[in-house]
Amino acid sequence: MEMQGTRQLKVQQQQAWDALNNPEVLKVCIPGCDRIEASGENEFSMGTALKIGPVSAKFSGKIMLTDMNPPASYTLNFEGQGGVAGFGKGTAAVELMPTPEGCELRYTVNAQVGGKIAQLGQRLIDGVAKSLSEEFFKRFDAETERLYPVQDSAAPVESPASQPQAQGWPNWVWVVGAVVVAALIYTMR
């Protein structure tokens, strides 16, 4: 399965990169996320609880970042397991392009899924994937507005999510994580 998309962000490219590399920001923004931890250089583990139609499951996953070109692009390799509910693996190419209004996030996800969730109807899976993606970006927009207010975009505002970042994880990785979760759901048909 392949999924592509773009999203206009209200923050500058570097600010988006920084926010996407902040595990606390990502934890707040990814629906159902209860854990994001560094497990090596440019490697992370995460836990997410999701409900897709009649199927509820806790997914554990690994993310590895490659082809990093800060603050412009990277490739995210992922795999996730939800027990009998299903599994998913794949890659996501992510780009942050500067625009006059802030920056544009572009992504292309290639994923494979299987298990019980793969047996659900395509329309249900598509709807959940779209809903998760929209919820992530809604939360991300709100969080970046708190961190980088329009009236003073040079000085971040202190908030619980603006604590020191874990080394090696750009903020866009978390956005990609949300896209990956949505892609996993989308491909589990």
Predicted regions mapped to residue ranges:
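Glycine-rich portal/gate segments that line the openings of hydrophobic small-molecule binding cavities
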Residues: 38-79
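Hydrophobic/aromatic beta-strand elements that line small-molecule binding cavities or substrate pockets
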Residues: 5, 34, 61-67, 90-98
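A conserved amphipathic terminal alpha-helix motif
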Residues: 116-156
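Hydrophobic ligand-binding cavity/cleft-lining segments
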Residues: 1-43, 51, 168, 174-189
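Intrinsic-disorder/low-complexity, polar/charged segments enriched in Ser/Thr/Lys/Arg/Asp/Glu/Gln
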Residues: 2-6, 43, 58-60, 73, ...
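Hydrophobic pocket/interface hotspot
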Residues: 16-20, 26, 65, 107, ...
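Short, Lys/Arg-rich cytosolic juxtamembrane segment immediately N-terminal
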Residues: 162-169
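Beta-strand/loop substructures that line and gate deep hydrophobic ligand-binding cavities in soluble
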Residues: 80-127
